[in-house]
Amino acid sequence: YNPDKFTPAVIEFVDIAGLVKGASKGEGLGNKFLSNIREVDAIVHVVRCFESDDIIHVEGSVDPARDIETINLELIFSDIEMAQRRLDKTAKALKGDKSLQGEVDFLKRLIAHLENGLPARSVEINDETEQNVLDTTALLSAKPVIYACNMSEEDFTSGIESNKNYNA
């Protein structure tokens, strides 16, 4: 295959400050983090998996599973607020436009899904209307995620399987 035009693939990485519990309520750099993350197409979540007395963890101990859950929950909490605002707006508009009933029903189901601690990317989509609502609501937990383990050099020489945090 000889294409007429060659376009190289480009990935731009944006380093966003870490997130802490309560970020969805504005704690730490929460609001700045959440606004920055809205601008990206996907999330690479770098998770600390190494122990070091020189680098203190914000929670006091290294626990990658806890850290992943903290971030996911903060994104979900932010999404619940976004989805609720959209539901309120759409429900008002529904009084004059009954064609919005499908959107209202989906938003209610989406909010219940989020309130169960599940990310928006895992909600069942039944039709184009629901997909459009999901795509246009700017939900953070709908973005694809890659988890990257930040490990010590020693872990790579001795084998990453021996790192208890990696296996978590």
Where are the language model's segments positioned?
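Conserved beta-strand/loop subsegment of P-loop NTPase cores
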Residues: E12, D41-R48, P64-T90, F106-L118, ...
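C-terminal-of-GTPase-core extension/linker across diverse P-loop GTPases
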Residues: K89-A168
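Switch II of P-loop NTPase G domains
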Residues: Y1-H45, F50-A65, E69, I125-T137, ...
